[in-house]
Amino acid sequence: MKCLERIGNQLLRGVMYHNSAADLFDFLGLNGFYKWQKHQAMDELDSLYYVKHYVMKTHHMLLTIDGSAETPTLFPSNWIGKSAMDATPAEITKAVQSALADLVIWERDAITIYEGIMEETTSSDAKKMLCELIDGSKEEICQIEKLQLKLKSTGYNMMFVHYLQDSYCEKYKK
């Protein structure tokens, strides 16, 4: 049961993390990246609901989630209380580059956490859930790294970043 609580807590942190990324991209007017990260947050939330439902139906208990985790932020601290119009193109470029790098780190850390839980659990259902979560994080890392390569090849040219938004909007429209 403890491993399921740890999975649930990690998923909740994931929801908050991807929500922070969505907020950053929304603030910057990068609607495609916003929809992408909103989609990722909803995927994490769906997984959290699945784990909670599994615990209720299998163990007839409520899953204890620690909601006191600090809300992560991908916003540069000097942007708090400012308008997006105050950000220079160089600051926006740096924020996008930094956010993507942070997302890769986040997903790698999630994999490490899930692998650690996998070593501790004997439940085949929990192991199956963990394998799916690990695979999802690996896919996300691949997607982000491909995007980073594209952007790096253009020097993180903001015209190209804006050009990409339509394809991300199309991919993640609901």
For each of these PLM feature ranges, what is it?
Residues 1-174:
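Iron-associated oxidoreductase/ferritin-like identity signal
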